[in-house]
Amino acid sequence: MNNNKSRVVLVTGACGGIGKALVNKYASQGNTIAIADKSQEQAHFLADEIQKRGGKAAAFPGDLLDKNYCDNLTKEVQIKLGAINILINNAGLMRRGDITQATDEDFELSMKINVEAPFRLIRAVIPLMTKAGGGSIVNVSSCWGVNPGPNHLVYCTTKAALAAMTRCLGRDHAHQNIRINAVCPNEVNTPMLRTGFEIRGLNPDD
């Protein structure tokens, strides 16, 4: 990334462990941050924190389970901040269990957060990036989306779907100067990991 040029960066799950680390890093490089998180209080607090440090940020709180929120978020960011140069689909849900323990709710919620929300956001942002001459999209998948771990069937399945979707999108839109990639972190010490797994991982800033 060229740190000499300010970009508008939209981050989902922006107030969680990895999300907040991404927000702070991009803000420190002079970028304008669109903070998308389900917690209205935390989203505005994080935006205020960045502004107090001399950075640029705006809060766009909402629930990724809400299709209207997903479909309209990019438009709202575009109107308020003027562009979306980078979209980071960071929000995620981890539910533990094998197939005998996984519930319909586990599967449906995980698919909506881990797969459908990125799908809707990307579908909405592609025309904006195309019109602007390009952009970058990053999907936060997981190493378990590539090499599944034990006792996390639903999580591994949805992250594998996100990784496959990323590969398809990358091929389809490279000619529009839109880079679409997935990052597949190992265990990172975040609240989501602590609720779904016993192993303590790296810190988000590492």
Segments from the language model and where they lie:
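Residue(s) in the substrate-gating loop at a strand-loop-helix junction
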Residues: 142
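Active-site loop-to-helix junction immediately N-terminal to the catalytic Tyr of the SDR YXXXK motif
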Residues: 102, 148-156, 168, 196
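Active-site helix of classical SDR
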Residues: 122, 158
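Short, flexible catalytic-loop segment of classical short-chain dehydrogenase/reductase
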Residues: 185-195, 199
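Conserved glycine-rich cofactor-binding loop
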Residues: 15-16
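Substrate-binding pocket helix/loop in short-chain dehydrogenase/reductase
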Residues: 98-99, 106-108
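Alpha-helical segment proximal to the catalytic Tyr-Lys
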Residues: 127, 171-175
